[in-house]
Amino acid sequence: MTRRLKEYALAAEIIGAIAVVISLIYVGVSVNQNTNAVMVANHQALVALDQATTDWFKDPDFAAAYIISLDDAGKLSAVQQAQFSSYLADKFNAWEFAFLTHESGMMEDNIWQGWDGHYRMLLQQSGGRWFWGEGREGFSPAFKSYLDSILATTE
C-alpha cells in the first residue's frame, strides 16, 4: 500500500509540474499580448494627439501665419506668435509623448522613426527653432537634451 501511495504521489507531482509549465506559458503569452495591445494604444493616442493639431489650419489667419513662420517666425505679430506657439506646444507635446513612449520600450522603432522624422521637420523650420528657444523649459530634461542634440547637428 505504501508503494502504491508513493506512485500516486509521484504521478501527482509530475502532473503538478506540467500544470505549472502550462500556466507559465499562458502567462507569457498573455503578457506578450498585453504589451502589444499597449503599444497599439500608444500609437493610437499619438495619432489622436497629432490629428487634433490639424484643426488649427481651418482658420485662414493661422494658416497664413504658419506660412510666414516657415521662413521667419520673427515676422509674426504678437497675436500670431501666441497662436503659433500654442500650435507648436501641441505638436511638441505629441513628439515628447512619442519620445518618452519609445524610450520606455512601448513604441516600436519603425513607428518611432516615422513620427520622429515628421516632427523633426517642424523643429528644423524657422518657426520650430523659434518656438524651441522660447518654450523648451516646458518639457522633460530627456526630451530637451534630445531636441538640443538634433539642433546641434543641423545648425
Predicted feature residues:
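General structural signal for secondary-structure boundaries
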Residues: E7, S77-A78, S126, S140
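Residue-level signal for alpha-helical context at structural boundaries
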Residues: A45, A52, D59, D71, ...
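Structural motif
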Residues: K75-L88
